[in-house]
Amino acid sequence: MSANYIEVQIFGQVLRFHCPPDQQENLLASAQRLEERVALLKDQSGIIQLEKVLTIVALNLNYELEQEKQKNANNKAVLESCIHQLDNSLSKLLSGSSVAINQESV
């Protein structure tokens, strides 16, 4: 097998993917987590049709991804506000004005 390809067994099927060597461990771990989530959902819900379970797992993963994107956007906004406040404080300090630190956004 070429160094850029990896075989992953998932749901009893062997799948072959093009994957850079430095990402192969992550791909294997992702496949394992997917199998675990599918198995857990099958056990909890009683749904036996793989397509339905995969659809629900995919929706759950996408929902979690969107939540993380929103958290990242919120964190970015807070950091940008802090940077802006620090920049203003430094400008005032360098110009000799008194500096008041606003801790509301921290």
UniProtKB/Swiss-Prot annotation:
One of its GO terms (biological process) is FtsZ-dependent cytokinesis. Its main location: cytoplasm. InterPro entries: Cell_div_ZapA-like (IPR007838), Cell_div_ZapA-like_sf (IPR036192), Cell_div_ZapA_N (IPR042233). Keywords: Cell cycle, Cell division, Coiled coil, Cytoplasm, Septation. Gene3D superfamilies: Cell division protein ZapA protomer, N-terminal domain (3.30.160.880). It is found in: Cytoplasm. The keyword Coiled coil applies. The keyword Cell cycle applies. It comes from the Bacteria. GO terms for cellular component: cell division site; cell septum; cytosol. Residues 22-81 form a coiled coil. SUPFAM superfamilies: Cell division protein ZapA-like. Homodimer. Interacts with FtsZ. Belongs to the ZapA family. Type 1 subfamily. Activator of cell division through the inhibition of FtsZ GTPase activity, therefore promoting FtsZ assembly into bundles of protofilaments necessary for the formation of the division Z ring. It is recruited early at mid-cell but it is not essential for cell division. This is Cell division protein ZapA.
